[in-house]
Amino acid sequence: MKIRFVCSCLVTLFALFVTSARAQETPTEREAAREMLKKMAELEKSLDAPALAARLTAANPAREQVVARAKELMDKELLALSDDITRHPEIGFVEHRSIKLLMDYLKQHDFEVKVGVGGLETAFVARYKRNNGAPNLGVILEYDALRGTTRAFHGDQHSAQGPVGIAAAVAIAEYLTRTNSPGGVVVFGCPGEEMMPPNAKTVMFEAGVFNGMDVIVRSHSSGATSRPAPGFGTCCMNIDGVKYIFSGAPAHQLQAWNGRNALEAVIHLFVNIDSVRSNIRPEARIQGVITEGGAAPNVVPDRAVADFYIRYPDEVYLQQVRKFVDDAARAAALATQTKVKIEHYGTARDGISVSTLAEVGFAYMKMYGATRIVAEPGRPQGFEETGSVSSAIPGLGFSAHSSNAANHTYEMEADALGEVGHHGFLVDAQAMTALLFDVATHPDYRAAIKREFDTIKTLFGEYQEALKRAYTVPRVSEP
């Protein structure tokens, strides 16, 4: 039995090492990460997260009592609240009805709520009144719907994030009070995840809203039950969101030389980008739309706007890609004798994932009945999309199977109201509660989480420095 267990751990560690390597998508990245990956493999071997998960998930009546309370809240009230929010979708930054329902529920359970944090009208922070100091446990909620062509809709099941997170927060807060145990619970209401600008979590992070948290958790819909490998990464590449705002001068189109055409400048921008693509590494993604292009065909457009997401697997080379696009905009303005304003409005960056949280959370999801289990860990990525919070504070995003449909579809919205969605939400709520219980009650576990997170954060810094040395810019001589 012992031999089989050791072999299993070695196989798991090898899988984690290989999966971590997949986070580096280009040859340059893989070479820069070579030494870092060796150090990470040594770290993961010393932590032995699978053995840690086996120990923590063993029978524990106190934990199961707290988990049962979270399930009771879901069954009696919070699944119905999830359905209500699903049926009344609100897009980002105008989620007034949704946050009122969530905040009212938190107030009824002894949370003190402050709304409008970080200067965002529908962002809020709810702190449990009887805070007993560290450890400080954070729970992130989202509640915005997607923008559809005919209506807003909860095709990413953000409608369930609030109820799931609240069930865990209330259950663990009540336990800490009942047992007079140390610890505080804070719920963060984060608007507009599907929209930027602004990037809500980054704005809140920069305003200090998340300061003092030891661990943060959240849930999210998924077509399968999974967890990330340890390391750093993001789901959708590193992103710079940039608007290029061109101004010209109006004139009658029959005498267009009397004006300066801002729309032509935008068209030149797209042409310029296409002309320099061969100078940019092929993994880059430069995706833009024209959001303003003039009001009438008989008037020279004096204002035009292009909105771009500029993506690359790492943020170091992303800066070179961004310079190509910025210079393409400046060249377009120069060629058309217009002016351009470059407005950088948002970023998404690599976050950090740790096996000490991921393996334990994954074990709990399976324990509480998760379906469609993905055996191997996925690529490393932060527990939230911006990287601002998840590169500074350890955490985990729970993702039990809650839909048979693809994300961002009407079918996923329908699943939020059905058996598959409700089952997945119950699994997430129970697993999240169990993990928070372990973090609150096991100082040695908190120390292991911190050790892993701090080490990976240091390795991430070393990796970025290696990339800076690798990504040289050719020297161009004077003509």
Predicted regions mapped to residue ranges:
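Positively charged n-region of N-terminal signal peptides that target proteins for export
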Residues: 1-5, 186
